[in-house]
UniProtKB/Swiss-Prot annotation:
It comes from Bifidobacterium longum (strain NCC 2705). Heterotrimer of A, B and C subunits. This is Aspartyl/glutamyl-tRNA(Asn/Gln) amidotransferase subunit B. Keywords: ATP-binding, Ligase, Nucleotide-binding, Protein biosynthesis. Belongs to the GatB/GatE family. GatB subfamily. InterPro entries: Asn/Gln-tRNA_amidoTrfase_suB/E, Asn/Gln-tRNA_Trfase_suB/E_cat, Asn/Gln_amidotransferase, Asn/Gln_tRNA_amidoTrase-B-like, GatB, GatB_C_1, GatB_Yqey_C_2, Gln-tRNA_amidoTrfase_suB_CS. HAMAP family: GatB. Allows the formation of correctly charged Asn-tRNA(Asn) or Gln-tRNA(Gln) through the transamidation of misacylated Asp-tRNA(Asn) or Glu-tRNA(Gln) in organisms which lack either or both of asparaginyl-tRNA or glutaminyl-tRNA synthetases. The reaction takes place in the presence of glutamine and ATP through an activated phospho-Asp-tRNA(Asn) or phospho-Glu-tRNA(Gln). It catalyses: L-glutamyl-tRNA(Gln) + L-glutamine + ATP + H2O = L-glutaminyl-tRNA(Gln) + L-glutamate + ADP + phosphate + H(+); L-aspartyl-tRNA(Asn) + L-glutamine + ATP + H2O = L-asparaginyl-tRNA(Asn) + L-glutamate + ADP + phosphate + 2 H(+).
Length: 499
Protein backbone atom coordinates (compact mmCIF):
# COMPACT_ATOMS: atom_id res chain seq x y z
CA UNK A 1 0.00 0.00 0.00
CA UNK A 2 1.37 3.38 -1.04
CA UNK A 3 2.37 5.70 1.77
CA UNK A 4 0.64 9.03 2.22
CA UNK A 5 2.73 11.99 1.06
CA UNK A 6 2.53 15.72 1.76
CA UNK A 7 3.19 18.21 -1.02
CA UNK A 8 6.90 19.04 -1.02
CA UNK A 9 6.42 22.80 -0.79
CA UNK A 10 4.03 22.39 2.15
CA UNK A 11 6.35 19.94 3.93
CA UNK A 12 9.39 22.23 3.73
CA UNK A 13 7.35 25.21 4.92
CA UNK A 14 5.88 23.38 7.90
CA UNK A 15 8.98 21.43 9.02
CA UNK A 16 12.69 22.12 9.32
CA UNK A 17 14.71 19.63 7.28
CA UNK A 18 17.87 18.04 8.69
CA UNK A 19 19.77 15.53 6.58
CA UNK A 20 23.12 13.80 6.47
CA UNK A 21 25.10 11.69 4.03
CA UNK A 22 27.47 8.77 4.46
CA UNK A 23 29.33 8.50 1.17
CA UNK A 24 31.31 5.31 0.53
CA UNK A 25 34.17 5.71 -1.95
CA UNK A 26 36.01 2.61 -3.16
CA UNK A 27 39.72 3.30 -3.52
CA UNK A 28 41.48 2.36 -6.75
CA UNK A 29 44.41 0.57 -5.16
CA UNK A 30 45.83 -2.50 -6.88
CA UNK A 31 45.27 -4.72 -3.87
CA UNK A 32 42.86 -4.99 -0.96
CA UNK A 33 43.09 -3.05 2.28
CA UNK A 34 44.59 -5.76 4.50
CA UNK A 35 45.85 -8.44 2.09
CA UNK A 36 47.56 -8.73 -1.33
CA UNK A 37 44.49 -9.99 -3.23
CA UNK A 38 44.09 -8.21 -6.60
CA UNK A 39 41.11 -5.90 -7.21
CA UNK A 40 39.20 -6.19 -10.48
CA UNK A 41 35.67 -4.97 -11.25
CA UNK A 42 33.49 -7.57 -12.94
CA UNK A 43 35.96 -10.43 -12.57
CA UNK A 44 35.03 -14.10 -12.21
CA UNK A 45 33.26 -14.46 -8.83
CA UNK A 46 35.29 -15.66 -5.85
CA UNK A 47 38.65 -15.71 -7.60
CA UNK A 48 40.44 -12.81 -5.85
CA UNK A 49 40.57 -14.23 -2.34
CA UNK A 50 43.07 -14.74 0.46
CA UNK A 51 42.70 -16.20 3.95
CA UNK A 52 42.42 -12.62 5.27
CA UNK A 53 39.55 -11.59 2.99
CA UNK A 54 37.74 -14.84 3.85
CA UNK A 55 38.36 -14.37 7.58
CA UNK A 56 40.02 -17.76 8.01
CA UNK A 57 41.41 -18.56 11.48
CA UNK A 58 45.02 -17.51 12.00
CA UNK A 59 45.12 -15.01 9.13
CA UNK A 60 46.50 -11.59 10.07
CA UNK A 61 45.78 -8.26 8.33
CA UNK A 62 48.54 -5.93 7.10
CA UNK A 63 47.57 -2.34 6.21
CA UNK A 64 47.85 -1.13 2.61
CA UNK A 65 50.06 2.00 2.74
CA UNK A 66 48.69 3.36 -0.53
CA UNK A 67 45.17 3.32 0.90
CA UNK A 68 46.38 5.34 3.89
CA UNK A 69 48.06 7.88 1.60
CA UNK A 70 44.84 8.18 -0.42
CA UNK A 71 42.91 8.80 2.81
CA UNK A 72 45.34 11.55 3.82
CA UNK A 73 44.97 13.26 0.43
CA UNK A 74 41.19 13.15 0.67
CA UNK A 75 41.36 14.51 4.20
CA UNK A 76 43.44 17.44 2.95
CA UNK A 77 40.97 18.11 0.12
CA UNK A 78 38.08 18.12 2.62
CA UNK A 79 39.88 20.50 5.02
CA UNK A 80 39.95 17.80 7.71
CA UNK A 81 42.12 17.56 10.79
CA UNK A 82 44.39 14.56 10.15
CA UNK A 83 45.04 12.55 13.30
CA UNK A 84 48.64 11.76 14.20
CA UNK A 85 47.36 8.54 15.77
CA UNK A 86 44.29 6.71 14.49
CA UNK A 87 42.95 3.25 15.20
CA UNK A 88 41.10 0.44 13.47
CA UNK A 89 38.13 -1.13 15.20
CA UNK A 90 35.99 -4.20 14.67
CA UNK A 91 32.39 -3.45 13.74
CA UNK A 92 30.56 -6.64 14.66
CA UNK A 93 27.54 -7.89 12.77
CA UNK A 94 26.40 -11.08 11.08
CA UNK A 95 25.56 -11.10 7.37
CA UNK A 96 26.54 -13.54 4.60
CA UNK A 97 28.65 -10.97 2.72
CA UNK A 98 30.95 -10.49 5.74
CA UNK A 99 32.78 -13.82 6.28
CA UNK A 100 34.64 -12.63 9.40
CA UNK A 101 31.37 -11.56 11.06
CA UNK A 102 32.97 -8.15 11.60
CA UNK A 103 34.11 -5.28 9.42
CA UNK A 104 37.46 -3.60 10.02
CA UNK A 105 36.61 0.08 10.25
CA UNK A 106 37.48 3.09 12.41
CA UNK A 107 35.34 4.25 15.30
CA UNK A 108 36.38 6.83 17.88
CA UNK A 109 39.85 7.45 16.41
CA UNK A 110 39.38 8.05 12.65
CA UNK A 111 42.16 9.22 10.36
CA UNK A 112 40.29 12.35 9.23
CA UNK A 113 37.85 14.47 11.22
CA UNK A 114 36.15 17.83 11.52
CA UNK A 115 36.29 19.04 7.91
CA UNK A 116 34.02 20.80 5.44
CA UNK A 117 33.29 21.10 1.75
CA UNK A 118 31.94 24.19 0.00
CA UNK A 119 29.59 23.20 -2.83
CA UNK A 120 28.33 25.47 -5.59
CA UNK A 121 24.64 25.28 -6.47
CA UNK A 122 22.87 25.96 -9.78
CA UNK A 123 22.39 29.67 -9.08
CA UNK A 124 26.00 30.17 -7.98
CA UNK A 125 25.20 30.05 -4.26
CA UNK A 126 27.90 28.37 -2.17
CA UNK A 127 26.73 26.11 0.68
CA UNK A 128 29.16 24.77 3.26
CA UNK A 129 28.64 21.10 4.18
CA UNK A 130 30.21 20.18 7.56
CA UNK A 131 32.08 16.86 7.64
CA UNK A 132 32.28 14.78 10.80
CA UNK A 133 34.89 12.28 9.61
CA UNK A 134 36.39 10.48 6.64
CA UNK A 135 37.54 7.09 7.88
CA UNK A 136 39.12 4.01 6.33
CA UNK A 137 37.38 0.63 6.26
CA UNK A 138 37.15 -2.50 4.16
CA UNK A 139 34.17 -3.39 2.00
CA UNK A 140 31.88 -6.39 2.29
CA UNK A 141 31.25 -8.99 -0.40
CA UNK A 142 28.36 -8.71 -2.82
CA UNK A 143 25.06 -10.57 -2.45
CA UNK A 144 22.97 -11.47 -5.49
CA UNK A 145 19.41 -12.50 -4.69
CA UNK A 146 18.00 -14.92 -7.27
CA UNK A 147 14.39 -15.68 -8.11
CA UNK A 148 12.69 -12.54 -6.85
CA UNK A 149 10.93 -9.91 -8.89
CA UNK A 150 13.21 -6.97 -8.16
CA UNK A 151 16.58 -8.42 -7.10
CA UNK A 152 15.90 -7.87 -3.40
CA UNK A 153 16.06 -10.55 -0.72
CA UNK A 154 12.29 -10.46 -0.18
CA UNK A 155 10.76 -13.09 -2.42
CA UNK A 156 14.10 -14.50 -3.61
CA UNK A 157 14.57 -18.27 -3.94
CA UNK A 158 18.21 -18.18 -2.91
CA UNK A 159 21.22 -15.86 -2.69
CA UNK A 160 24.71 -16.01 -4.15
CA UNK A 161 27.73 -14.35 -2.53
CA UNK A 162 30.80 -13.04 -4.36
CA UNK A 163 33.68 -12.33 -1.95
CA UNK A 164 35.89 -10.61 -4.54
CA UNK A 165 34.77 -7.26 -3.12
CA UNK A 166 35.35 -8.32 0.49
CA UNK A 167 38.36 -6.40 1.77
CA UNK A 168 38.42 -3.73 -0.94
CA UNK A 169 39.50 -0.42 0.68
CA UNK A 170 36.85 2.24 1.22
CA UNK A 171 36.75 5.70 2.65
CA UNK A 172 33.45 6.56 4.29
CA UNK A 173 32.82 10.31 4.38
CA UNK A 174 30.26 11.15 7.06
CA UNK A 175 28.73 14.61 7.23
CA UNK A 176 27.57 16.26 10.39
CA UNK A 177 23.80 16.94 10.46
CA UNK A 178 23.22 19.41 7.63
CA UNK A 179 20.93 22.22 8.74
CA UNK A 180 19.55 25.32 7.04
CA UNK A 181 19.04 23.70 3.64
CA UNK A 182 15.26 24.06 3.61
CA UNK A 183 13.63 23.15 0.31
CA UNK A 184 17.07 23.03 -1.36
CA UNK A 185 18.12 19.94 0.60
CA UNK A 186 17.92 17.58 -2.43
CA UNK A 187 19.89 20.00 -4.62
CA UNK A 188 22.56 20.49 -1.95
CA UNK A 189 22.89 16.73 -1.43
CA UNK A 190 23.29 16.10 -5.16
CA UNK A 191 25.84 18.90 -5.54
CA UNK A 192 27.80 17.63 -2.53
CA UNK A 193 28.08 14.04 -3.75
CA UNK A 194 29.01 15.24 -7.26
CA UNK A 195 31.71 17.41 -5.67
CA UNK A 196 33.05 14.38 -3.76
CA UNK A 197 33.08 12.42 -7.04
CA UNK A 198 35.02 15.20 -8.77
CA UNK A 199 37.53 15.50 -5.92
CA UNK A 200 38.39 11.79 -5.69
CA UNK A 201 38.79 11.64 -9.47
CA UNK A 202 41.04 14.71 -9.42
CA UNK A 203 43.12 13.07 -6.69
CA UNK A 204 43.18 9.89 -8.81
CA UNK A 205 42.24 7.77 -5.80
CA UNK A 206 38.96 6.33 -7.09
CA UNK A 207 37.10 5.76 -10.35
CA UNK A 208 33.97 6.90 -8.47
CA UNK A 209 31.53 5.30 -10.90
CA UNK A 210 28.23 4.99 -9.10
CA UNK A 211 26.86 2.61 -11.74
CA UNK A 212 29.67 0.16 -10.88
CA UNK A 213 29.05 0.44 -7.15
CA UNK A 214 32.44 1.96 -6.32
CA UNK A 215 30.70 5.05 -4.99
CA UNK A 216 27.41 4.97 -3.12
CA UNK A 217 25.67 6.87 -0.35
CA UNK A 218 23.47 6.28 2.68
CA UNK A 219 20.94 9.09 3.05
CA UNK A 220 19.69 10.18 6.49
CA UNK A 221 16.63 12.45 6.77
CA UNK A 222 14.72 13.82 9.75
CA UNK A 223 12.21 16.62 10.32
CA UNK A 224 11.56 18.88 13.29
CA UNK A 225 8.99 21.62 13.88
CA UNK A 226 11.54 24.47 13.99
CA UNK A 227 15.31 25.08 13.73
CA UNK A 228 15.64 25.42 17.51
CA UNK A 229 13.82 22.15 18.27
CA UNK A 230 15.68 18.87 19.00
CA UNK A 231 16.46 16.64 16.03
CA UNK A 232 13.63 14.39 14.91
CA UNK A 233 13.88 10.63 14.44
CA UNK A 234 15.81 9.88 11.26
CA UNK A 235 15.43 7.30 8.56
CA UNK A 236 18.49 5.92 6.76
CA UNK A 237 18.11 4.92 3.12
CA UNK A 238 21.00 2.59 2.31
CA UNK A 239 23.25 2.26 -0.73
CA UNK A 240 21.71 4.80 -3.10
CA UNK A 241 23.85 4.60 -6.23
CA UNK A 242 22.89 7.56 -8.41
CA UNK A 243 22.96 11.32 -7.96
CA UNK A 244 19.33 11.58 -9.04
CA UNK A 245 18.43 8.78 -6.64
CA UNK A 246 20.01 10.68 -3.74
CA UNK A 247 18.04 13.82 -4.59
CA UNK A 248 14.79 11.90 -5.05
CA UNK A 249 15.31 9.94 -1.82
CA UNK A 250 15.56 13.13 0.23
CA UNK A 251 12.56 14.66 -1.50
CA UNK A 252 10.45 11.54 -0.95
CA UNK A 253 11.47 11.10 2.69
CA UNK A 254 10.62 14.73 3.47
CA UNK A 255 7.14 14.25 1.99
CA UNK A 256 6.60 10.87 3.67
CA UNK A 257 7.77 11.92 7.12
CA UNK A 258 5.82 15.21 6.98
CA UNK A 259 2.61 13.32 6.19
CA UNK A 260 3.18 10.90 9.09
CA UNK A 261 3.94 13.71 11.54
CA UNK A 262 0.84 15.59 10.39
CA UNK A 263 -1.26 12.49 11.10
CA UNK A 264 0.29 12.12 14.57
CA UNK A 265 2.17 8.97 13.60
CA UNK A 266 5.63 7.96 14.81
CA UNK A 267 8.71 8.14 12.58
CA UNK A 268 10.56 4.85 12.93
CA UNK A 269 14.35 4.83 13.17
CA UNK A 270 14.90 2.32 10.40
CA UNK A 271 16.93 1.51 7.35
CA UNK A 272 15.10 1.94 4.06
CA UNK A 273 15.68 1.07 0.41
CA UNK A 274 15.31 3.37 -2.61
CA UNK A 275 13.27 1.76 -5.40
CA UNK A 276 14.19 3.35 -8.71
CA UNK A 277 11.23 1.79 -10.51
CA UNK A 278 8.57 3.20 -8.18
CA UNK A 279 10.54 6.31 -7.13
CA UNK A 280 9.78 5.50 -3.48
CA UNK A 281 11.59 4.27 -0.38
CA UNK A 282 10.57 1.03 1.30
CA UNK A 283 11.04 0.10 4.95
CA UNK A 284 13.73 -2.36 5.96
CA UNK A 285 14.90 -3.21 9.45
CA UNK A 286 14.58 -1.17 12.62
CA UNK A 287 17.88 0.48 13.49
CA UNK A 288 19.32 1.33 16.88
CA UNK A 289 22.47 3.26 17.75
CA UNK A 290 26.07 2.36 16.93
CA UNK A 291 26.39 0.41 20.18
CA UNK A 292 24.61 -2.45 18.41
CA UNK A 293 27.84 -3.09 16.54
CA UNK A 294 29.91 -3.53 19.74
CA UNK A 295 32.92 -1.65 18.37
CA UNK A 296 36.26 -2.42 19.98
CA UNK A 297 39.91 -1.88 18.88
CA UNK A 298 41.14 -4.53 16.46
CA UNK A 299 43.80 -6.47 18.40
CA UNK A 300 45.50 -7.60 15.17
CA UNK A 301 46.34 -4.04 14.05
CA UNK A 302 48.56 -1.53 15.82
CA UNK A 303 47.54 2.12 15.94
CA UNK A 304 48.22 4.02 12.71
CA UNK A 305 50.89 6.72 13.11
CA UNK A 306 50.90 9.55 10.55
CA UNK A 307 53.73 12.02 11.04
CA UNK A 308 53.55 15.73 10.23
CA UNK A 309 56.39 15.20 7.77
CA UNK A 310 54.37 12.60 5.87
CA UNK A 311 51.34 14.89 5.75
CA UNK A 312 53.57 17.59 4.23
CA UNK A 313 54.74 15.06 1.61
CA UNK A 314 51.11 14.37 0.70
CA UNK A 315 50.37 18.10 0.52
CA UNK A 316 53.17 18.53 -2.00
CA UNK A 317 51.52 15.90 -4.24
CA UNK A 318 48.06 17.52 -4.21
CA UNK A 319 46.75 18.44 -7.68
CA UNK A 320 44.56 21.41 -8.57
CA UNK A 321 41.14 20.91 -7.00
CA UNK A 322 38.01 20.75 -9.20
CA UNK A 323 36.50 24.07 -8.15
CA UNK A 324 39.73 25.99 -8.77
CA UNK A 325 40.21 24.15 -12.06
CA UNK A 326 36.67 25.01 -13.21
CA UNK A 327 37.18 28.68 -12.45
CA UNK A 328 40.51 28.70 -14.31
CA UNK A 329 39.10 26.99 -17.41
CA UNK A 330 35.99 29.18 -17.38
CA UNK A 331 38.26 32.21 -17.52
CA UNK A 332 40.65 30.74 -20.13
CA UNK A 333 37.80 29.63 -22.40
CA UNK A 334 35.72 32.79 -21.93
CA UNK A 335 32.62 30.90 -20.77
CA UNK A 336 29.62 32.15 -18.84
CA UNK A 337 28.49 30.45 -15.62
CA UNK A 338 25.63 28.83 -17.54
CA UNK A 339 27.94 27.46 -20.25
CA UNK A 340 30.29 25.97 -17.65
CA UNK A 341 27.32 24.45 -15.82
CA UNK A 342 26.17 22.78 -19.06
CA UNK A 343 29.62 21.23 -19.42
CA UNK A 344 29.59 19.97 -15.82
CA UNK A 345 26.06 18.59 -16.11
CA UNK A 346 27.14 16.62 -19.20
CA UNK A 347 30.25 15.35 -17.34
CA UNK A 348 32.30 16.63 -20.27
CA UNK A 349 34.92 18.88 -18.66
CA UNK A 350 37.81 16.39 -18.89
CA UNK A 351 36.96 15.50 -22.49
CA UNK A 352 36.73 19.13 -23.59
CA UNK A 353 39.98 20.03 -21.84
CA UNK A 354 41.78 17.10 -23.50
CA UNK A 355 40.34 18.14 -26.88
CA UNK A 356 41.65 21.68 -26.38
CA UNK A 357 45.06 20.31 -25.36
CA UNK A 358 45.05 18.31 -28.61
CA UNK A 359 44.76 21.51 -30.63
CA UNK A 360 41.07 22.43 -30.90
CA UNK A 361 39.52 25.72 -29.86
CA UNK A 362 37.33 25.51 -26.74
CA UNK A 363 34.19 26.61 -28.62
CA UNK A 364 34.57 23.85 -31.20
CA UNK A 365 35.33 21.19 -28.59
CA UNK A 366 32.31 22.25 -26.54
CA UNK A 367 30.07 22.17 -29.63
CA UNK A 368 30.94 18.53 -30.39
CA UNK A 369 30.86 17.08 -26.87
CA UNK A 370 27.66 18.86 -25.80
CA UNK A 371 25.95 18.50 -29.17
CA UNK A 372 26.39 15.63 -31.61
CA UNK A 373 28.31 13.37 -29.22
CA UNK A 374 25.95 13.93 -26.28
CA UNK A 375 23.01 12.97 -28.49
CA UNK A 376 24.88 9.84 -29.61
CA UNK A 377 25.71 8.87 -26.01
CA UNK A 378 22.11 9.40 -24.88
CA UNK A 379 20.78 7.34 -27.78
CA UNK A 380 23.11 4.45 -26.91
CA UNK A 381 22.61 4.77 -23.15
CA UNK A 382 26.34 5.19 -22.46
CA UNK A 383 28.55 7.92 -21.03
CA UNK A 384 30.53 10.27 -23.28
CA UNK A 385 33.73 8.54 -22.16
CA UNK A 386 32.40 5.21 -23.44
CA UNK A 387 31.86 6.45 -27.00
CA UNK A 388 34.41 5.07 -29.51
CA UNK A 389 35.87 8.50 -30.21
CA UNK A 390 38.73 10.28 -28.45
CA UNK A 391 39.46 13.95 -27.72
CA UNK A 392 42.31 13.67 -30.24
CA UNK A 393 39.79 12.56 -32.90
CA UNK A 394 37.53 15.53 -32.20
CA UNK A 395 40.52 17.89 -32.31
CA UNK A 396 41.55 16.41 -35.68
CA UNK A 397 38.06 17.07 -37.09
CA UNK A 398 38.22 20.66 -35.86
CA UNK A 399 41.62 21.11 -37.54
CA UNK A 400 40.19 19.80 -40.83
CA UNK A 401 37.37 22.36 -40.58
CA UNK A 402 39.78 25.19 -39.74
CA UNK A 403 42.03 24.32 -42.70
CA UNK A 404 39.07 24.45 -45.09
CA UNK A 405 39.18 20.74 -45.91
CA UNK A 406 35.77 19.98 -44.36
CA UNK A 407 32.55 21.92 -43.94
CA UNK A 408 30.10 21.32 -41.09
CA UNK A 409 28.15 18.61 -42.92
CA UNK A 410 31.25 16.68 -43.98
CA UNK A 411 32.66 17.05 -40.47
CA UNK A 412 29.49 15.51 -39.04
CA UNK A 413 29.73 12.62 -41.52
CA UNK A 414 33.38 12.16 -40.57
CA UNK A 415 32.51 11.93 -36.88
CA UNK A 416 29.76 9.43 -37.70
CA UNK A 417 32.36 7.33 -39.52
CA UNK A 418 34.68 7.37 -36.51
CA UNK A 419 31.79 6.30 -34.25
CA UNK A 420 31.06 3.41 -36.63
CA UNK A 421 34.64 2.19 -36.28
CA UNK A 422 35.85 3.22 -39.73
CA UNK A 423 39.11 4.62 -38.36
CA UNK A 424 40.56 7.99 -37.46
CA UNK A 425 39.02 11.16 -38.94
CA UNK A 426 41.77 11.32 -41.57
CA UNK A 427 41.13 7.68 -42.54
CA UNK A 428 37.36 8.27 -42.78
CA UNK A 429 37.90 11.34 -45.00
CA UNK A 430 40.17 9.35 -47.35
CA UNK A 431 37.85 6.33 -47.40
CA UNK A 432 34.82 8.38 -48.50
CA UNK A 433 36.78 10.96 -50.48
CA UNK A 434 35.26 13.79 -48.48
CA UNK A 435 36.37 17.15 -49.86
CA UNK A 436 34.87 20.57 -50.34
CA UNK A 437 33.86 21.31 -53.94
CA UNK A 438 35.45 24.64 -54.84
CA UNK A 439 35.06 24.28 -58.63
CA UNK A 440 32.87 27.24 -59.62
CA UNK A 441 31.74 25.39 -62.73
CA UNK A 442 30.35 22.49 -60.70
CA UNK A 443 28.78 24.85 -58.18
CA UNK A 444 27.19 26.99 -60.93
CA UNK A 445 25.72 23.89 -62.56
CA UNK A 446 24.20 22.80 -59.24
CA UNK A 447 22.83 26.32 -58.59
CA UNK A 448 21.28 26.45 -62.08
CA UNK A 449 19.59 23.10 -61.43
CA UNK A 450 18.29 24.35 -58.08
CA UNK A 451 16.95 27.54 -59.71
CA UNK A 452 15.19 25.52 -62.38
CA UNK A 453 13.58 23.25 -59.78
CA UNK A 454 12.46 26.14 -57.54
CA UNK A 455 11.27 29.05 -59.75
CA UNK A 456 9.01 30.49 -57.04
CA UNK A 457 11.95 30.67 -54.62
CA UNK A 458 14.07 32.40 -57.27
CA UNK A 459 11.37 35.07 -57.74
CA UNK A 460 11.31 35.79 -54.01
CA UNK A 461 15.08 36.08 -53.90
CA UNK A 462 15.10 38.47 -56.86
CA UNK A 463 12.47 40.62 -55.13
CA UNK A 464 14.77 40.99 -52.11
CA UNK A 465 13.23 38.32 -49.85
CA UNK A 466 16.26 36.32 -48.68
CA UNK A 467 14.39 34.02 -46.27
CA UNK A 468 14.11 31.09 -48.74
CA UNK A 469 17.85 31.22 -49.56
CA UNK A 470 18.26 28.02 -47.53
CA UNK A 471 16.12 26.10 -50.04
CA UNK A 472 18.60 26.80 -52.84
CA UNK A 473 21.67 26.18 -50.70
CA UNK A 474 20.13 22.94 -49.40
CA UNK A 475 19.44 21.73 -52.94
CA UNK A 476 23.01 22.52 -54.00
CA UNK A 477 24.41 20.73 -50.94
CA UNK A 478 22.28 17.69 -51.73
CA UNK A 479 23.45 17.68 -55.34
CA UNK A 480 27.10 17.90 -54.27
CA UNK A 481 26.72 15.34 -51.42
CA UNK A 482 27.34 18.10 -48.90
CA UNK A 483 30.77 18.84 -50.36
CA UNK A 484 30.15 22.33 -51.74
CA UNK A 485 31.57 25.28 -49.87
CA UNK A 486 28.58 27.14 -48.43
CA UNK A 487 30.22 30.55 -48.85
CA UNK A 488 31.03 29.80 -52.49
CA UNK A 489 27.44 28.65 -53.10
CA UNK A 490 26.03 31.82 -51.52
CA UNK A 491 28.36 33.96 -53.66
CA UNK A 492 27.24 32.23 -56.89
CA UNK A 493 23.54 32.50 -55.95
CA UNK A 494 23.85 36.21 -55.14
CA UNK A 495 25.71 36.80 -58.40
CA UNK A 496 22.97 35.15 -60.44
CA UNK A 497 20.20 37.03 -58.62
CA UNK A 498 21.83 40.41 -59.15
CA UNK A 499 22.92 39.55 -62.69
Amino acid sequence: MAEKLMKYADATKKYDVVFGLETHVELSTNTKLFCPAHIEFGGEPNTELTPVSLGLPGSLPVINKTAVDYAIKLGLALHCEIAEWSQFARKNYFYPDMPRDYQISQYDKPTNGNGYLDVELEDGTVFRVPIERAHIEDDAGKNTHVGGADGRIEGADHSLVDYNRAGVPLIEIVTKPIEGAGDRAPEIAGAYVRAIRDIVRALNISHARMEQGNMRADVNVSLRPSPDAPYGTRSETKNVNSFRGIEKTIQYEIRRQAARLDDGKEILQETRHWDEATQTTAGGRLKSDADDYRYFPDPDLVMLHITKEHIEEMKAQMPEMPRERRNRLKSEWGLSDLQMRDILNADALDLIEETVKAGAKAAGARKWWLGELSREANAKGVSLEELPITPADVAEVEKLIASGKLNDKLAKQTVEGVLKGEGTPDEVVKKHDYKIVEDNGAIEAAVDAAFEANPDVVEKLKSGNMKPMGVIIGAVMKATRGQADAKAVTKVVMGKIKG
